[in-house]
């Protein structure tokens, strides 16, 4: 009997320790790697190209959406889109080598800057934004690629950064920097909606729901304008 009691006491004493042991966690799935400049976004597409494109359209969500909304425009003209939604000029500069220069196009069509004004990666002076644009232009020119600079669309609000207020003045200033630089260096500069009434400070709703991202009709106007340049 004494032996039974001792065994029971030993079992009871060890119970808290046994139940306190944490269950072995299941192996966690490794999250997909995402670099700051998102080099991985077009790595596969770049490796699968069988010939150099006539033009690389380089930019942010506007360019990203263009290739998705009207892919036939790109394939039929031997163009490729290398836009990434939300990107600033700093990020574009970092991936320029992989997504533009390495593809050896005849042209780089650059539309960028609105996300810098929106402070997507923090506050940045317009002069520094312009320096990024100039750096991209100078780098592609070293590789015999012709740059084409595009002006930012007018808008009185940035819906994902409403607290910043009306960005009109900054857009005008940056566009003036871009156009002045282009003129001084004999670079093609495109204002896609030059002939559209923008007296409201925005693109018409028939072309863009937020005056930043064009709809298909807006992209069709852009296509007719850029084809005048990419000869």
Predicted segments — roles?
Residues 1-56, 68, 103, 180-185, ...:
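N-terminal secretory targeting modules
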Residues 61, 84, 114:
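Active-site metal-binding loops of divalent metal-dependent hydrolases
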Residues 63-69, 88-91:
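Short, solvent-exposed loop/turn elements at domain surfaces
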């Amino acid at each position: 009997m004494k032996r039974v009691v001792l065994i029971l006491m030993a079992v009871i004493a060890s119970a808290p320790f046994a139940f306190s042991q944490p269950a072995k966690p299941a192996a966690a799935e490794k999250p997909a790697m995402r670099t700051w400049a998102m080099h991985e976004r077009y790595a596969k597409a770049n490796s699968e190209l069988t010939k150099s494109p006539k033009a690389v359209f380089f930019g942010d969500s506007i360019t990203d959406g263009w290739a998705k909304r009207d892919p036939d425009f790109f394939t039929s003209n031997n163009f490729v889109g290398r836009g990434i939604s939300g990107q600033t000029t700093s990020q574009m500069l970092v991936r320029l080598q992989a997504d533009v220069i390495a593809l050896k196009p005849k042209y780089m069509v650059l539309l960028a800057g609105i996300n810098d004004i929106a402070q997507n990666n923090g506050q940045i002076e317009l002069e520094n934004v312009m320096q990024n644009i100039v750096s991209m232009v100078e780098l592609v020119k070293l590789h015999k690629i012709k740059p084409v600079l595009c002006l930012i669309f007018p808008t009185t609000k940035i819906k994902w950064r409403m607290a910043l207020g009306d960005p009109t003045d900054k857009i005008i200033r940056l566009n003036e920097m871009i156009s002045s630089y282009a003129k001084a260096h004999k670079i093609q500069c495109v204002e896609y909606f030059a002939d559209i009434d923008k007296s409201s400070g925005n693109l018409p709703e028939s072309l863009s729901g937020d005056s930043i991202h064009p709809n298909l009709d807006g992209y069709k106007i852009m296509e007719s304008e850029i084809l005048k340049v990419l000869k």
